[in-house]
């Protein structure tokens, strides 16, 4: 059965008030809304020693990612000209710029490939199902349509072979896009229960795809799929898990985005421990690891 996730549910992110308690080799970046104003969004950064600071501000930030050159990209939407999506670029040195635009769209997931191209999923404001268009932005900002999804789509992630995966919550399907843009179904609705829709995506070093699911809080789950699509449950008992990211040591970090206010970042270690990495957050969404800035 199709389950439609209303966009307004995910227009709220939050500022981090919690303090990281574990140090890691790379910094952890988190997109945060703060409130429902154009000025409330920000990106927080945790240093390897666990110190948190605000890296940047941006209206309605969502997906975040680094490329191989150390450029940091943010999927942002300007609500003053609703909806106007923009991919923001933060180089290792220099000033913020706009890599590209997507008019009348709300941007969600974002990912980069090894060639430095940026992929962002834009939810069409005129579509009743908020159908997704995956735009490809070349390093010079040239925009092309890489692919489409039938319904509201959240997370994007690349596997090691250069295939792009997209979590379509409306169709309850994970779509796989070959490097040439050919779309196939990786797993469909039968891979999920009637109370699960896919949201965040992250690959581990073995090529397994981790999928956060929404719709059954406070007993939401993270599922894991092998490269051939065989699924199993990684963990349950979560509250609205969304963005995920692995650190260099293979620990999984998950943002719990509580719609009524609050949220945290959980760490699942390779030893099987579940740790609250940061608490007291107000609706965190997407995560990524990258070099200190």
Residue locations for each model-derived region?
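N-terminal secretory signal peptides that target proteins for export/translocation
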Residues: 1-6
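A short beta-strand motif characteristic of beta-propeller blades
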Residues: 50-56, 95-101, 142-148, 182-192, ...
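Beta-rich, blade/repeat-based domains predominating
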Residues: 38-41, 58-78, 83-84, 102-125, ...
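A short loop-to-beta-strand structural motif that recurs across blades of beta-propeller domains
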Residues: 41-44, 84-88, 132-135, 172-176, ...
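Bacterial N-terminal signal peptides
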Residues: 11-20
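Sec/Tat signal peptide C-region and signal peptidase I cleavage site
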Residues: 21-25
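Conserved beta-strand element within WD40/beta-propeller blades
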Residues: 30, 74, 120, 166-167, ...
């Amino acid at each position: 059965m199709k389950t439609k996730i209303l966009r307004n549910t995910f227009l709220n992110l939050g500022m981090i008030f919690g303090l990281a308690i574990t140090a890691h080799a790379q910094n952890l970046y988190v997109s945060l809304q703060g409130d429902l104003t154009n000025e409330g969004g920000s990106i927080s950064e945790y240093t390897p020693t666990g110190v948190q600071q605000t890296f940047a501000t941006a209206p309605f930030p969502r997906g975040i990612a680094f490329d191989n050159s150390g450029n940091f990209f943010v999927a942002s939407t300007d609500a003053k000209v609703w909806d106007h999506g923009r991919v923001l670029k933060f180089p290792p040195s220099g000033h913020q710029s706009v890599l590209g635009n997507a008019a009348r769209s709300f941007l969600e997931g974002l990912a980069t490939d090894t060639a430095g191209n940026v992929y962002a999923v834009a939810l069409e404001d005129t579509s009743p199902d908020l159908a997704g268009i995956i735009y490809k932005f070349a390093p010079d900002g040239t925009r092309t349509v890489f692919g489409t999804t039938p319904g509201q789509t959240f997370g994007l992630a690349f596997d090691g072979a250069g295939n792009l995966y997209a979590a379509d919550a409306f169709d309850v399907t994970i779509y796989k896009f070959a490097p040439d843009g050919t779309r196939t179904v990786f797993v469909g609705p039968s891979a999920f229960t009637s109370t699960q829709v896919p949201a965040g995506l992250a690959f581990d070093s073995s090529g397994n795809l981790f999928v956060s699911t929404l719709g059954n809080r406070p007993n939401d789950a993270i599922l894991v799929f092998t490269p051939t699509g065989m699924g199993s449950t990684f963990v349950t008992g979560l509250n609205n898990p969304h963005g995920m990211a692995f650190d260099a040591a293979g620990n999984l970090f998950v943002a719990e985005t509580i719609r009524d206010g609050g949220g945290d970042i959980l760490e699942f270690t390779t030893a099987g421990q579940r740790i609250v990495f940061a608490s007291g957050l107000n609706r965190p969404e997407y995560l990524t690891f990258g070099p200190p800035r």
